[in-house]
Amino acid sequence: MERCGSWSDCEAAAAAAQKAVPAPFLTKTYQLVDDPATDHIVSWGDDRVSTFVVWRPPEFARDILPNYFKHNNFSSFVRQLNTYGFRKVVPERWEFANEFFRKGEKQLLTEIHRRKTSSASTASPSPPPFFAPPHFPLFHHPGVAAAQHHHAFVGDDGVVAAHGIGMPFPQPHWREPNLPVATRLLALGGPAPSPSSAEAGGAGRAATAAVLMEENERLRRSNTALLQELAHMRKLYNDIIYFVQNHVRPVAPSPAAAAFLQGLGMQARKKPAAANVLNNSGGSTTSSSSLTIAEEPSPPPQQQHLAGEKSGGEAGNSSAARSSAPTKLFGVHLSAAPCGAGSKRASSPEEHPPTSPATKPRLVLECDDLSLTVAPSSSSQQQLSAASSPTSTS
């Protein structure tokens, strides 16, 4: 194995070797992005120069990733992009950018380097068992241990490499805690990163963490606002339901409107009855009296009912009084005499159908055969005979 004269020479040689060939991940990523057959899934960005967009992540992970890598995990692909310095351009879609990842300039991929972590233990795989050489002291005085460690790793790196010292140890208690970072990484066998690259990696991680925290905070605020709005709408809904159930009653019609509607219904039912009364009274041949019916405004239904009962009672009382007491005209007793040729039979109830409560019939007696008999005052009560046709009122 060829030895380097100093650490700077070894680092320069390693950097030159790495620049000659880009990382396989970058080469495969460039190929899958530059493939025109899959532009509907992944393609160059809007500027078609320095960004690329994954339009359909599910299809990208299912159909494209297995063709270039040994997995189909989209999250793992994104993590690899982050380790090589790619950044997400906009949060709305999976668009990534890197200043050296440009269309038609594949040679620039050698300028893209993997970010180095601050501790080699986080980037290295689990170590094999440590077998120290016989001349390598595990426990020494701190000052002597530091000097021997530095001499062993720098002067005799072949022996160290042969024994696998380049791997991290489960319990590295043999190292000095207060040694510089470069010395510790040298003891572990990994290349010591320059301070600028370490600071850049730390700044990149800090920026990514800040962006993620800001996005989480924004989502949390949005979620809180939505929950508050939902609770407010539920409260309004419950208040409306409570108000309708406990404070709203059906509106009853006013008395005037109710009477008007009831009157319309009763008149519609009673008009045929009034027409029948007119027809029956006009066609009667058993009485010479004429019946004249005059329409008057109908009172309310309750008053009509009371008036009907009252008129019925008065008619019964008056007919009974007329049958028991003599008839007088201007203080002169009248004797009933048949009108016309002879006495007429009493009219049957069928000939006089009941009239409607809305109409009050007025009876006008027309009889030409009325006879008056004036008896002397000394004689006992003699009645005047008057011929009149008996009429009945309903």
Swiss-Prot record:
UniProt cross-references to SMART domains, sorted A to Z: HSF
Any one Gene Ontology BP term: regulation of transcription by RNA polymerase II
Region (Hydrophobic repeat HR-A/B): 219-248
Keyword check for ATP-binding: no
InterPro entries registered for this protein in UniProt: HSF_DNA-bd, WH-like_DNA-bd_sf, WH_DNA-bd_sf
Keyword terms: Cytoplasm, DNA-binding, Nucleus, Phosphoprotein, Stress response, Transcription, Transcription regulation
Region (Disordered): 276-394
Entries under Pfam families matching the protein: HSF_DNA-bind
Post-translational modification comment from the UniProt entry: Exhibits temperature-dependent phosphorylation.
Gene Ontology terms, MF aspect: DNA-binding transcription factor activity; sequence-specific DNA binding
Short motif (Nuclear export signal): ranges: 365-372
Motif (Nuclear localization signal): 269-271
Task performed by this protein: Transcriptional regulator that specifically binds DNA of heat shock promoter elements (HSE).
Family, as annotated: Belongs to the HSF family. Class B subfamily.
Protein name in the entry: Heat stress transcription factor B-4c
Gene it is expressed from: HSFB4C
